[in-house]
Every structure is written in C-alpha cells, then in structure tokens.
C-alpha cells in the first residue's frame, strides 16, 4: 500500500479516535456540572491540557520556537470567541440531556457553510442551501418551542455553535502563519488566565445563583474536589488535549471534506454516554431533531466532497489522476 493510500485511512482513524475522545470531555463536564463551578472545571482542564501541549512542543522538532507569532490581536480575538463558545456550550450542556446538546451543537458545520458564502464569498449551490434550511428546521425542533416557550439552554448551545463556526473562520484566516500548536497554546493560556481571574473574583460564591437557574453552573463557589471526582477533572483535560491533537493530525494529513463526516461519531457516543451514565434516552422530539441536523450536516459534507472531486477532475491534465 502506498503512502498516499495510507493517508486517508490514517486521517479517518485520527478523526474517529478524536471524536470518541472528545466525547469523554462532554461526559466529564456533564458529570461535574451538578457540583462544581464551570470556571473551576475549565481552569483544571486547561492546566491538564496545557501540560499535554507543552509536552508535545518539547519533543517536537521546532520546539518552543513555533510559539512565536506576528498576529497577537488575531489570537486574542480567536481565543475570545473560543471561550464564549465553551462557556455557552457547557452551561447549556448542564441543563440539557447530553445527546440533545451535542445534536444542537452539530449545527456548526451548517453555519460554516453559511459563513463561507457570506464572509469568504465561496460559492454555495442550491442543494447545500437546502441542507442548511433542513438543518435549521432540526434546530427549531431541538429548541422545543411548544406553547411559545424557547428552551434557553438550546439557545446557549446555538450561540456556542455560532462561535465555534466563527473560530473555524479565524483558523482558516491564520493557517498560513500559525501552527496548530501555536493556536492550541494560546487558547489554553486564555482559559487559564480568564478562569483564574474569574475564580478570584467570584470563587467565594457571592454571585451564586438559585438551584436550577440557568447560570447556576457558572457562578457556583469553588471547593476542593474529593478524590472520587478527580477522574472527571483529569478526563476532561486529557480528552481535550489528546482529542484536539488527534483532530489536528486528521485534518493535517487528510482532505477536510473526507475527514469531517467522521466527526459525527460524537453523536452516537453522546447517546451512548447519556444512556449508560445518565440513564437519559432521547425522546421522539430529540430523535427528529438529531436526524435533521446530522442528516443535513452529513449531506452538506458529501456535496462538498463531490464538488472538490469535480474541481480536481476538471483542473487535472489527462492521465494525472
């Protein structure tokens, strides 16, 4: 088997492994959301993730030289939207069944398509626009607007998906000058600085919200975790560090349109964790939303693959492919 033929298999392997690993992060955050403050969880997660990033940098060929950047303001903006994406997603996750939150977040690939057309002026055909529309119908279903009441948690996850898609736009803008390690390093730095500052300000619990309120997870006081809970703190840090690196490797070695559909392994994993750990099985409404959002996302990625293959066939001289 040639190196070229191995690359897609390797990229798919990393994408599947990364998707499964990152699903552990959602599981761990969900498990911790009933007892701890979000900024405490994020701080510990960031320290663990930073240790992994620094370890990889230490053993890499270019070492810490790769952390030099000429785009500090772009990093600041990207880190800011990544943090908003994380906070809104995890607050929403604390209030929703795991599978519902993950399904709603999977609207992000559709938002990337929308932003690519509006911001990057990329051509989007009518079929992909139709897929975006179908996915948005799924989003409306997931917000459960019965009796005129929109579920606030779902709105938070939608805000997260928008910010997540925006971070992809920033990554594309920065990809020619910034390495994956540089992007990851500054994100972890941002998490550490902001969560530590927020903890010093609100960690005593003076902003604590009433039990069951939307922002309870964000404003709880800090407390020292018992030994029995450390598995979840370590799991979320390791999952983000290792899963993020696996996803980066997948997209580095294999065409994005081929890799992206395999990220949807996170959906069955979310259903699995929800049933096994939390005893939460998606209801009929959730299944309808999951089918529409994931189906539309996968169709969009499939159309993108066909479009790119057609472009390559047209561009390549006869006999080159």
Model regions and ranges:
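Loop-to-transmembrane-helix transition segments
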Residues: 10-16, 63-88, 152-158, 209-242, ...
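C-terminal transmembrane-helix exit sites in multi-pass transporters
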Residues: 108-130, 268-286
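Transmembrane alpha-helical segments that form core, pore/gating elements
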Residues: 30, 53, 149-210, 219, ...
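C-terminal-most transmembrane helix of multi-pass membrane proteins
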Residues: 268-321
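Hydrophobic/small/kink-forming positions within alpha-helical transmembrane segments
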Residues: 19, 23, 54, 79-87, ...
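Transmembrane alpha-helices of multi-pass small-molecule transport proteins
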Residues: 35-84, 163-167, 187-203
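Helix-helix packing/entry segments at the starts of transmembrane helices
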Residues: 102-107, 175-190, 241-275
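Hydrophobic transmembrane alpha-helices of multi-pass small-molecule transport proteins
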Residues: 127-144, 160, 285-304
């Amino acid at each position: 088997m040639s190196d070229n033929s191995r690359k897609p298999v390797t990229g798919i392997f990393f994408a599947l492994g990364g998707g499964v690993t990152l699903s552990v992060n959602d599981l761990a955050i969900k498990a911790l959301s009933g007892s701890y403050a979000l900024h405490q969880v994020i701080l510990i997660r960031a320290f663990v993730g930073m240790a992994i990033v620094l370890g990889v940098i230490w053993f890499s060929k270019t070492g810490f030289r790769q952390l030099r950047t000429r785009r500090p303001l772009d990093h600041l903006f990207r880190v800011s939207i990544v943090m908003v994406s994380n906070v809104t997603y995890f607050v929403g996750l604390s209030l929703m069944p795991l599978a519902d939150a993950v399904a709603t977040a999977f609207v992000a690939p559709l938002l990337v398509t929308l932003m690519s057309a509006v911001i990057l002026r990329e051509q989007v055909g009518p079929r992909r626009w139709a897929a975006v529309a179908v996915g948005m119908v799924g989003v409306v279903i997931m917000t459960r607007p019965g009796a005129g009441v929109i579920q606030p948690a779902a709105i938070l996850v939608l805000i997260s998906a928008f910010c997540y898609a925006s971070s992809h736009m920033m990554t594309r803008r920065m990809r020619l000058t910034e390495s994956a390690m540089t992007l990851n390093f500054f994100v972890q730095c941002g998490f550490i600085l902001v969560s530590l500052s927020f903890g010093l300000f609100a960690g005593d619990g003076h902003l604590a919200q009433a039990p069951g309120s939307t922002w309870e997870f964000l404003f709880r006081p800090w407390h020292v975790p018992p030994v029995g809970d450390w598995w979840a703190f370590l799991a979320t840090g390791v999952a983000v560090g290792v899963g993020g690196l696996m996803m980066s490797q997948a997209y580095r070695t294999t065409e994005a349109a081929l890799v992206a559909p395999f990220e949807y392994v996170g959906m069955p994993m979310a259903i699995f964790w929800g049933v096994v750990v939390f005893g939460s099985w998606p209801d009929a409404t959730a299944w309808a939303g999951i089918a529409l959002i994931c189906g539309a996302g996968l169709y969009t990625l499939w159309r993108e693959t066909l479009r790119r293959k057609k472009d390559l066939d047209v561009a390549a001289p006869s006999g080159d492919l």
